């Protein structure tokens, strides 16, 4: 019978093979779009700033068509480069579009002066200037910037110009993070990240764009695979560039942490809390199929190479193989573990229609049971004595008991806590009154009491690590739809 299992494993491997691995697929058979991309032949600070404003205006213009917006956006992201033509050539390495490079020698009264090699007539140059002047109505001051007169302020030198360029590019990169996932709810996270870069000095407040401009840029990114291919190539270069050597690629590398593995959260959370915890529940026969599936998915992720973290941004069809419905039971167990071990998952909407509430409850129980358990490998490496192990287990048990009665200011209402706003406030108030704890605002006193309890437990080192049982598990999310308790022992 072993041959049957071998054949089954090979079948799973064949089903999870990345698309296009055999070669001979369609390459360039669809119609190619001509995307005009602008480059500047001058290093003059004022000309470079005029070029950036020109590209930004076209990228958000209401009169510009899609290819023109896409080309202007690529030009905007290349505007920091010493030789822009070489940088633009990176974007041309694709089968989705053909880039037509239009060289600009300078600007005269806001009108670009094209090089003769570009073959752009004076009439067409005037048309580009008219398109650049058609901004969204929400830009009330007639510029893409919230601060009026920001674009008319001439830069002092090339350093000032680069700071302005990076301020705009940072806002463009921030929009990439949720361009392909939850773009309709991206305003809050974009504002938070822009504020972060302002505090770091990477974005100047004077050159903050209108939200409608960022939304238009984000829509262009969603609609254009050519732009997204260029963005991924820049993200790869940012990861391969040594830290501290390039201001621009330091920024790209920082933004990369928000973009990598977007859309794969369920897969990596399942690996972290379902596989990496190495609980005895993995021996259940009912989880063997999901574990085998995860094994094949990990192999598929490695086969994707450098493009694996950017499957969502590229619109890769292989991303659907990583959906949690493919390993629903193991996913349910992992989310039960995460709901107890990691309160940071509170903002992740893990409750799905296909979730098994039985396996979710099993994960909760295992996570609570592991709260005071000891990692034997780490204990052996630290050379802990039996008395120290018992003391550590007792301290962990004591902490779990103390924290259950303390009003934690970070507790949030949500599916993980099972509390409504009124219920959580009543619970916190009742706990303070019954236990005689300080008021909610006195968090320092509560923290000191907690640390004293831990220190006392470590000094006592009791002979037995057993304590009172922990409080009950958190409520099961969603209605109870399965009463099957056969775990396949």
UniProtKB/Swiss-Prot annotation:
GO terms for molecular function: RNA binding; structural molecule activity. It holds the Pfam family Paramyxo_ncap. Residues 1-375 are annotated as: P protein-binding. Residues 1-402 are annotated as: Ncore. Residues 422-437 have a biased composition (Polar residues). InterPro entries: Paramyx_ncap. It is found in: Virion; Host cytoplasm. It comes from the Viruses. The keyword Mitochondrion does not apply. Keywords: Capsid protein, Helical capsid protein, Host cytoplasm, Ribonucleoprotein, RNA-binding, Viral nucleoprotein, Virion. Residues 403-489 are annotated as: Ntail. Residues 421-489 are annotated as: Disordered. GO terms for cellular component: helical viral capsid; host cell cytoplasm; ribonucleoprotein complex; viral nucleocapsid. RNA binds at residues 178, 193, 258, 348, 352. Ncore is globular and carries the regions required for self-assembly and RNA-binding. Ntail is an intrinsically disordered monomeric domain in the C-terminus. Homomultimer; forms the nucleocapsid. Binds to the viral genomic RNA. N0 interacts with the phosphoprotein (via N-terminus); this interaction allows P to chaperon N0 to avoid N polymerization before encapsidation. Interacts as N-RNA template with the phosphoprotein (via C-terminus); this interaction positions the polymerase on the template. Forms the helical nucleocapsid (NC) in a ratio of 1 N per 6 ribonucleotides, protecting the genome from nucleases. The encapsidated genomic RNA serves as template for transcription and replication; encapsidation by N is coupled to RNA synthesis. Forms the encapsidation complex with the phosphoprotein protein P. Before encapsidation, the newly synthesized free N protein, so-called N0, is chaperoned by P. Belongs to the paramyxoviruses nucleocapsid family. This is Nucleoprotein. The gene is N.
């Amino acid at each position: 019978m072993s041959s049957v299992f071998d054949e089954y494993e090979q079948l799973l491997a064949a089903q999870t093979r990345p698309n296009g691995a055999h070669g001979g697929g369609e390459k360039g058979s669809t119609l190619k779009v001509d995307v005009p991309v602008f480059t500047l032949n001058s290093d003059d600070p004022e000309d470079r700033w005029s070029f950036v404003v020109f590209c930004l205006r076209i990228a958000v213009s209401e009169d510009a068509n899609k290819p023109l917006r896409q080309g202007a956006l690529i030009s905007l992201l290349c505007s920091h480069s010493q030789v822009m033509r070489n940088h633009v050539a990176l974007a041309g390495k694709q089968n989705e579009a053909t880039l037509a490079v239009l060289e600009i020698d300078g600007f005269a009264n806001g009108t670009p002066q094209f090089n003769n090699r570009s073959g752009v007539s004076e009439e067409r140059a005037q048309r580009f200037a008219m398109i650049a002047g058609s901004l969204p109505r929400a830009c009330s001051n007639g510029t893409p910037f919230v601060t009026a007169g920001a674009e008319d302020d001439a830069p002092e030198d090339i350093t000032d110009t680069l700071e302005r360029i990076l301020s705009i590019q940072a806002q463009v990169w921030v929009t990439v993070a949720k361009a392909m996932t939850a773009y309709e709810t991206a305003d809050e996270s974009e504002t938070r990240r822009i504020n972060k870069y302002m505090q770091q000095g990477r974005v100047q407040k004077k050159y903050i764009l209108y939200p409608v401009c960022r939304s238009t840029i984000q829509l262009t990114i969603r609609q254009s695979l050519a732009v997204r291919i260029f963005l991924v190539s820049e993200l790869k270069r940012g990861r391969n560039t040594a830290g501290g050597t390039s201001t621009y690629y330091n920024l790209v590398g920082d933004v990369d942490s928000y973009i990598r593995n977007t859309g794969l959260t369920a897969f990596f959370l399942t690996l972290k809390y379902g596989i990496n915890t190495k609980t005895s529940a993995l021996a259940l026969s009912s989880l063997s199929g999901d574990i085998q599936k995860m094994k094949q998915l990990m192999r598929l992720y490695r086969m994707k190479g450098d493009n694996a973290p950017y499957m969502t941004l590229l619109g890769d069809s292989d991303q659907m193989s990583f959906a949690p419905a493919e390993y629903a039971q193991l996913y349910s167990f992992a989310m039960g573990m995460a709901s107890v071990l990691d309160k940071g998952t509170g903002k992740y909407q893990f409750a799905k229609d296909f979730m098994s509430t039985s396996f979710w409850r099993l994960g909760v129980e295992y996570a609570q049971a592991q709260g005071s358990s000891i990692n034997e490998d780490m204990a052996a490496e630290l050379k802990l004595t039996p008395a120290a192990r018992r003391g550590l287990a007792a301290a962990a048990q004591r902490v779990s008991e103390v924290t259950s009665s303390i009003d934690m200011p970070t507790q949030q209402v949500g599916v993980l806590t099972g509390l409504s706003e009124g219920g959580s406030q009543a619970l916190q108030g009742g706990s303070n009154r019954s236990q005689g704890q300080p008021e909610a605002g006195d968090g320092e006193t509560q923290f000191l009491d907690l640390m004293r309890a831990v220190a006392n437990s470590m000094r006592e080192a009791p002979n037995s690590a057993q304590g009172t049982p922990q409080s009950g598990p958190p409520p099961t999310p969603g209605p109870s739809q399965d009463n099957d308790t056969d775990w396949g022992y």
